[in-house]
Amino acid sequence: MMRFTKSLLASVALCSLLSLPARAELDVAKLKTTIEASVENDYPKLDALYKDLHAHPEIAFQEVKTAAKLAAEMRAIGFEVTEQVGKTGLVAIYKNGDGPTIMVRTELDALPMEEKTGLPYASHDTTNWNGRETPVAHSCGHDIHMASWVGTAKTLVGLKDQWHGTLMFIAQPAEEEIAGAKAMLDDGLFTRFPKPDVGFALHDGASAYGTVSYRVGIGSSNQDGLFIRFHGRGGHGAMPQNTIDPVMIAARFVVDVQSVISREKDPTEFGVVSIGAIHGGTAGNIIPDNALVVGTIRTFKPEVRTKMLAGIERTAKAVAAMADAPPPDINLDAGAKAVVNDPAVVATAEKVLKAAFGDKIRTTPPNTTSEDYSEYVNAGVPSMFFNI
C-alpha cells in the first residue's frame, strides 16, 4: 500500500497546489490527512485494478484492453474521455472552472519478457512480437503507475472544492519503445485538447522505501539507437584469405568504439556506448557476407551527444576501411531526448513535497536511463518528473 499512498499523495499535492488561486494558501497537513483517508477508502479497488493490470499486460501499441479499462475507470469518476489518441492512447479531461490546465501522464505498455515472480496474480499472457509468440510482463512498474493515476484522478475530483482549473490525464502507449509520446503529439494532443500549463509524471523505482526523489534540470539521458551493418565477402572458414570477414570487423568496432568514451569525451561528462547484440552468419565454418551490430548510446548534454555520434560513425568507417571492406550502413537512430525539469515548477512543488514528506524527500543525480516524457517538455510544457 505504501507505494500507492506515496505516489498518490505526491501527485495530488502537486496538482492541487498548482491549481489553486494565487491568493490561496495550501494547508498541507490537512490536505495530507484528507488524501490519506481517501486513499485508505479507495485502496481495495485500486489494488484490485493494479493486480488485474499486472496479470494482463500488453506491449507497445497493443494496449487495447488496458486502455479500455482505464477509460471506463475515468468515465466513472466523471472525466470526459477520448480514446485512440496516438493509436491506443487516451485523454481524460475534467473541467472545474477557470484556471490552469494540469497534465498528469501514465504509461500503458508492458515488456516482451517472462515474469518469474511466482505471484498469484503473475502474468501468463503471451503475444506475437517480432513474429514469435512471446511472454509479456509488467516489469517496469507501469501497472503501479496506472493504478496510482486512476487513484490520483479520483482523489482530486473528491477535492474539487479546493482547486479550480482543468485536469488533463493522459494514458500514453509505447513508452518502452520511445514512441508513444510522439504518436500522441502527432495525433493532435495539444491541438485537439488544451495545451497544459504544467505537466507531471512519476516512476516507481528501487530507491529507499517510501522516498520521493527528483532534481532540477536534466533528469534523464538522451537515447540514440545504434544499428551498423558491416559488409564483407563470405567464404569458407578454412580459407579466410579469400574473404573479407565482417564478423572480425564488427568485433574490432565493438572494442575500438569504446575509445570514443575514454579518449574523446570529457571524462567529467556522462556518456556510454553499450553493444547489446551482434548478428552474423549461420555456421561456425562459414564466414558470412555481413554482420549487424546493435547497441545504445546515452548522454546528458547535446554537445556530448554530437561528439559521440561523430566518433562512433568515424570509428565504424575506419574499421571497415582497415579491412578493405565496403563502407558500412550506419543508422544512429535518434530516440528520447533528456527530460529537463522546470526550475520554477520544481521550486513550487518542492514546498509541498517537503511539507508532506519531510526527510523522505531526496534530490538525486540525473538518471542514466531514458524516457519519452521529454517530448511533452520539448513541446513547451513546463514539467516535473519525479520518482517514488
Language-model regions: role of each:
Residues M2-R23:
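Gram-negative bacterial Sec-dependent N-terminal signal peptides
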